Amino acid sequence: MSKKTEFSTVLDDPIPLSEFSLTANNGSIFNIESLKEKWSLLFFGYTNCPDVCPLTLHQLSQANKELESKVEHLPNIIMISVDPDRDTTKILDKYVTSFTGNVIGATGSIAEIKKLTGQLGIFFEANKGEGKNYSVNHSAAVILINKKAEFHAVFSAPHSTDHFIKDLPKIL
């Protein structure tokens, strides 16, 4: 059974995550240990996304900026790429550092990405029949991970900065 805040669903019993291994935009290892000791907002997207991904990352960045005086510790904002063929760490670094605040990017093999997406109910599929400028269909949910690296809550789309500002202080 889970309880629902105004714009997110909080799990009564957070679900521990299993191991996965990705590479962060700065070249360091990004794994389950990277999610411990600090709350994290995970979003799965890709750098060539024309709309949902940049908008969601902007909304998360703006929410964190607004929450600076309202919460003791701001959550990390992490974009996991669902397009590892094009999203190298260098490209991902340029992309995530263009947003306000400390946005982290991570990428890896499809198998490792699926280890994480499978645990969180995130779907993604590349439309590679479109040529080199293909799109990637993906879930737009934002997942809140607690300090124990457990799936704690989900923000379902559509998102707005205000939704994150209203619900995050109630949860963190």
Over which residues does each language-model region extend?
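Conserved helix-turn-beta segment immediately C-terminal to the redox Cys motif
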Residues: K38-W39, L55-I80
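N-terminal targeting signals for export/organelle localization
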Residues: M1-E19, T23, I171
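Short loop/turn microsegments at loop-to-beta-strand junctions
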Residues: L17-S18, W39-S40, S139-A141
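Short, internal strand/loop/helix patches
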Residues: D93-S139
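Short active-site neighborhood of thiol/selenol oxidoreductases, capturing the structured segment around
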Residues: I32-T56, L60
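Short, acidic, Ser/Thr-enriched surface-loop or helix-capping motifs
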Residues: A24-N25, N146
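Thiol-/selenol-based redox modules, centered on thioredoxin-like
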Residues: E130-L172
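Thiol-based oxidoreductase modules, predominantly thioredoxin-like and allied folds used
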Residues: L74-D87, N102-A111
